[in-house]
A protein has these predicted regions:
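Surface-exposed extracellular loop regions of Gram-negative outer-membrane beta-barrel proteins
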Residues: 286, 341-345, 398-405, 448-461, ...
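Outer membrane beta-barrel strand-and-loop segments of large Gram-negative receptors
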Residues: 365-371, 422-424, 522-528, 534, ...
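Gram-negative outer-membrane beta-barrel transporters
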Residues: 434-435, 449, 553-556, 576-667, ...
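Flexible loop and strand-edge segments within Gram-negative outer membrane beta-barrel domains
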Residues: 21, 253-259, 269-330, 341-363, ...
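Short, acidic, small-residue-rich periplasmic hinge/interaction motif at the N-terminus
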Residues: 21-62, 98
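Short acidic/polar hinge/loop motifs at secondary-structure boundaries
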Residues: 110-140
Length: 737
């Protein structure tokens, strides 16, 4: 009897061990054969791309339950995100931010000619509920993606329509979401519907979100919390601006906003190797208050009564043609024609001032890209061309809120014609040797960019000494890298790549008050393109049970565009908006460098359980008169730790996100680090403890629960003008089939 029991127990443990090994092997195979699209315009196994790519799946996005796409990136622990207002989120990749990284949606470049060098919120115009896969390509990627890809590229792939099995139109899939969060009284609803036949398919996705004012944490250092509380609000009382006490100083009044996102895609396959697609996207928001500007005071008196972004509108209409498994030299072809329209505006009024300033920017972007791929056992060759034409209309006026009188004021960008054209030819090659153990990536790109702006009224335009601005730039960029995989467990990489960024309207032509009454940025027509050289090494180990990744990089930046002191009409200061203000401008500095590295791991001690962690470090300086000065946008040490159970029926995770201290000595003195919103010693280090879980109540319906910042810590991300959320309870219901 004892032998039978012992044999039974032994057999049971053997089966468990076999099952565990099979699951771990399955996970390993999935990771090894993971497909990405950011590397060369076509679907490619991640292991064949030398450059570091972080991939976030649709399942991971759903489990995160993030309120927007910027928060998805924050939750990974791999990407730092800055916020000046709740309706924002500006990713930083390897010390580059805003116009120095590229956003790409469904193969279409989102960056336009007014992507600024400071902080952006454009990524939140992409609904994370519509994303199928998100990829972060780390380091210069100009060979394939062109200008602006200095720090990297964020590739957003939206969900494709699902085809049916017959000629009859049928429901082929659906998704829905309802979510409530307590820290900002978030109310989000989402619905998506797939309809299809065997040749035609449609996908419609609609999301609406209502975000209230964000409440910050109540636990922290008293002296810091005093700085970051909002003790007042500004209201009109008897037609006069009045400072009133904020009844809840932890509530960051004037941070709430609303947003609507719509995605509509059609797909048609007349034959098995031809596909036509139409992609329609629309995103719009309510007014988005600039909380950082509304919290500013001078001698205890509010500086601004009103400061908000108007509704941020983004539309995209694109046609895509794909042909695959073709006979002849080229096996695959993809081509896209697109039109994008973006409307942004800024509205501000000083405290107890009657003049409400309105500045509006409308930009239309026509674009195309065409790529051809050849594949054989050893070689893959992708060649192609892409281009964009940007047309900008910038207008401005001042409204007297008492009399209603409207008068012209200086526009943010030139008030005449503004055109920017980007053109590129590229080739990317992959060579596989020794049965795929050695993979070589090499590529080359030719860039040609032009910019032309005219000023119609130079008297209103801040009395600028010129009326016509022109620039033409050419460049060659490339990459060369090798991946060596001596076994299925081990992978080592070396990579060299160059990046290129041509100055846009925001760099060359804007008039902008960066810090109220302290710093005025004026145009500089003598800017040159920024050029980077990047050296990178990587190490990956994955035996199914332990996955370990480490990397290091060194980037040389030539002609780095930084904000520094300047003279305008021979003077170092000028009157702007009624105040004598120091003059600054974007300028090329001869040299800059950024280096850093990171390590991440996932350890799976048994089926369904995993321990994970990551940490990243970045350091950057530029040379000014033989003095090394900190570059702006360089985040502190960042990272994440987590323990997770993930079963097909339910999952649960405890995790912590942390940031190191950013001391004042490491702040850029003139750039976009927002030193005025930090503490006397800089940005303190912090960590949060968080929990999330989900379980299926039936096959297609999932309940989700989360508690973020369980300890209710009061903290702020580096360079951010508002504090992060305090303790936040999240309740959600999802439906998918």
């Amino acid at each position: 009897m004892k032998k039978i029991i012992i044999l039974s127990i032994s057999a049971l443990f053997t089966q468990i061990a076999i099952a565990q090994k099979q699951e771990l092997d399955s996970l390993k195979n999935i990771q090894l054969n993971q497909v990405v699209i950011s590397g060369n315009k076509f679907a490619e196994k991640k292991k064949n791309i030398v450059q570091k790519i972080d991939v976030i799946s649709q399942k991971e996005i759903a489990q995160m339950n993030a309120q927007n796409t910027a928060d998805v990136l924050t939750n990974t622990g791999q990407v730092f995100v800055q916020k000046s207002q709740q309706g924002g989120g500006s990713p930083v990749i390897r010390g580059f931010e805003a116009s120095r990284i590229q956003l790409n949606i469904d193969g279409i470049r989102m960056n336009n000619a007014i992507y600024r060098s400071g902080h952006l919120q454009n990524i939140i115009t992409v609904d994370n509920n519509s994303i199928e896969q998100l990829e972060v390509l780390n380091g210069p990627a100009s060979t394939i993606h062109g200008s602006d890809a200095l720090g990297g590229v964020i590739v957003l792939k939206t969900k494709d329509p699902k085809f049916g099995k017959s000629k009859r139109l049928e429901l082929t899939g659906a998704n829905a979401l309802m979510r409530y969060s307590t820290a900002n009284q978030e109310k989000t609803g989402n619905i998506g519907i797939h309809l299809g036949t065997n040749k035609f398919a449609s996908y419609t996705n609609i999301t609406f979100s209502d975000f209230g004012d964000l409440v910050q944490g109540k636990n922290g250092v008293d002296s810091i919390m005093k700085l970051w509380k909002k003790p007042f609000i500004v209201a009109r009382v008897n037609n006069t601006d009045t400072m009133l006490a904020n009844t809840d100083p932890y509530k960051q009044v004037s941070t709430g906003y609303k947003q609507l996102d719509i995605l509509q895609k059609f797909s048609f396959t007349p034959t098995k190797n031809i596909r036509h697609g139409v992609n329609i996207q629309y995103s719009n928001s309510s007014n988005i208050p600039r909380y950082d500007r509304l919290s500013e005071t001078a001698a205890g008196i509010a500086k601004n009564a009103t400061w908000y972004y108007g509704p941020q509108t983004r539309t995209l209409l694109a046609y895509q043609f794909d042909a695959f498994d073709l006979k002849g030299f080229f096996n695959d072809v993809t081509a896209t024609l697109s039109h994008q329209f973006v409307n942004e505006s800024r509205h501000n009024r000083g405290y107890k001032k009657a003049a409400l300033n309105h500045r509006d920017e409308k930009i239309n972007v026509l674009g195309y890209n065409v790529a051809f791929r050849h594949k054989d056992n050893k070689h893959e060759l992708t060649i192609g061309t892409d281009g964009q034409l940007n047309n900008l209309k910038s207008t401005a006026f001042k409204e007297d809120i008492v009399t209603g009188l409207e008068t012209k004021i200086d526009t943010r960008y030139p008030d005449g014609k503004n055109n920017m054209y980007l053109f590129g030819l590229f080739a990317q090659h992959t060579l596989k040797l020794d049965n795929g153990k050695v993979v070589i990536n090499d590529g080359l790109r030719f860039n040609y960019n032009t910019l032309h702006s005219t000023l119609l009224d130079t008297s209103i335009q801040f009395q600028l000494p010129f009326s016509d601005l022109k620039q033409k730039n050419k460049s060659l960029t490339g990459n060369l890298g090798v991946a060596y995989m001596p076994s299925s467990d081990l992978r080592m990489t070396l990579n060299y790549s160059t990046g290129f960024r041509s100055p846009n309207f925001d760099d060359m032509t804007k008039v902008f008050e960066s810090v109220s009454g302290q710093r005025l940025i004026v145009p500089n027509v003598n800017l040159k393109p920024e050029i980077t050289q990047n050296f990178e090494a990587g190490f990956q180990y994955n035996d199914g049970k332990l996955e370990l990744n480490a990397y290091g990089f060194y980037t040389l930046l030539k002609n780095a565009i930084v904000t520094d002191k300047f003279t305008f009409n021979g003077k170092d200061s000028a009157f702007y908006d009624g105040q004598l203000t120091a003059v600054y401008a974007s300028q090329n500095k001869s040299k800059a460098f950024i280096y850093g590295g990171g390590i991440s791991f996932i350890y799976r001690p048994m089926n369904h359980f995993s321990l994970s962690g990551s940490t990243n470090y970045t350091f950057g300086r530029y040379n000014s008169d033989s003095i090394l000065i900190p570059l702006d946008h360089i985040p502190p040490v960042t990272g994440r730790l987590g323990i997770k159970y993930d079963h097909k029926k339910w999952y649960g995770e405890f995790y912590s996100i942390y940031n190191g201290k950013k001391g004042l000595i490491d702040y850029n003195p003139n750039g976009e680090d927002n030193i005025q919103y930090s503490t006397p010693s800089g940005t303190p280090s912090w960590f949060t403890v968080n929990f999330r879980a989900g379980f299926f109540v039936e096959k297609h319906t999932q309940m989700q629960l989360g508690v973020e910042n369980i300890l209710d810590k009061n903290y702020r991300y580096f360079a951010s003008g508002m504090s992060a959320a305090g303790r936040n309870l999240i309740i959600a219901v999802r439906y998918n089939f």
